[in-house]
Amino acid sequence: MIQIDFEKMGGLVPAIIQDYQTNEVLMVAFIDEKALKLTLETGKTWLFSRSRNKHWMKGEQSGNTQEVQEVYTDCDADALVIKVKQNGGAACHTGNRSCFYVRWEDGAWVEHSEPLFDPDEVYKK
């Protein structure tokens, strides 16, 4: 039986979050054993924040939740691909659909999308 190797990176594995219909990469984050268990049990994307040292459900503040459709691991069982239905349009905390909206072009990084929401309004502290 395949077991995810959480030991290789100190209890975490990278998780590539991808749109299940278009295969667009929405974000990359880290997941630990508890977050994976919550993801599989609830059908929502749960991640582990290294900066806040806590578990969080994607969309818990913005409302832009993700409904898990499929979960894959790689051949070494040390990385995940989580295919989701993205609710609310934006997966990125900047308000963009994807966290990968900046492209290298002619020697500079160039933004290639407009935010779908204002993060200052959504994440008021």
Swiss-Prot record:
The keyword Cytoplasm applies. It comes from Syntrophotalea carbinolica (strain DSM 2380 / NBRC 103641 / GraBd1) (Pelobacter carbinolicus). GO terms for biological process: L-histidine biosynthetic process. GO terms for cellular component: cytoplasm. Keywords: Amino-acid biosynthesis, Cytoplasm, Histidine biosynthesis, Hydrolase, Magnesium, Metal-binding, Zinc. This is Phosphoribosyl-AMP cyclohydrolase. Its cofactor is Mg(2+); Zn(2+). GO terms for molecular function: magnesium ion binding; phosphoribosyl-AMP cyclohydrolase activity; zinc ion binding.
